[in-house]
């Protein structure tokens, strides 16, 4: 029985580590069939960090979120102005944002909350967020639905 418990525990730990490693990666796909995967650490190292403190409608308290501006990500991976961006979550939920939002509201792909990595349990590893305190008129269901969490892929529609 001890051996069986040990084997089950070993398999669980192995799966949890693999799952955790995969969860900390973000796939960026272009409509012209090119894609790349970037880790949380690479996002932190390759892009300027953008932070803001805001109150999200589903949280009791304001929190400080840090991440990369979506516009910085698209500037690297899609230098021509993209048409639309789609965000996919681990549970296959999808949301889209218009390119105008990138300039006007500067949403971020957040990877930390109050200085800590966002776990899957806390809606991570990546979340698309708007600064609702800076732009209170965005605190409406239409924009709440765009603030997707547990992001695992960003699809950039740019190719003709």
Located regions from the model:
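Bacterial N-terminal signal peptides
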Residues: 8-17
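N-terminal intrinsically disordered, low-complexity segments enriched in P/E/S/T
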Residues: 22-160
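Bacterial N-terminal signal peptides that target proteins for export
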Residues: 1-8
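N-terminal cationic leader/targeting segments used for protein routing and processing
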Residues: 3, 18-20
């Amino acid at each position: 029985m001890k051996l069986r418990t040990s084997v089950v525990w070993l398999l669980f730990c192995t799966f949890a580590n693999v799952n955790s490693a995969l969860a900390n990666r973000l796939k960026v796909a272009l409509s012209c069939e090119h894609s790349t995967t970037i880790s949380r650490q690479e996002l932190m190292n390759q892009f300027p960090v953008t932070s803001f403190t805001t109150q999200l409608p589903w949280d009791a308290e304001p929190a400080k979120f840090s991440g990369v501006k979506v516009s910085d990500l698209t500037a690297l991976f899609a230098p021509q102005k993209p048409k639309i961006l789609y965000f996919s979550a681990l549970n296959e939920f999808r949301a889209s944002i218009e390119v105008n939002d990138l300039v006007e509201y500067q949403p971020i792909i957040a990877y930390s909350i109050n200085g800590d990595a966002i776990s899957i349990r806390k809606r991570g590893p990546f979340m698309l967020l708007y600064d609702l305190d800076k732009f209170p008129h965005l605190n409406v269901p239409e924009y709440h639905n765009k603030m997707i969490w547990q992001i695992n892929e960003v699809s950039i529609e740019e190719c003709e």
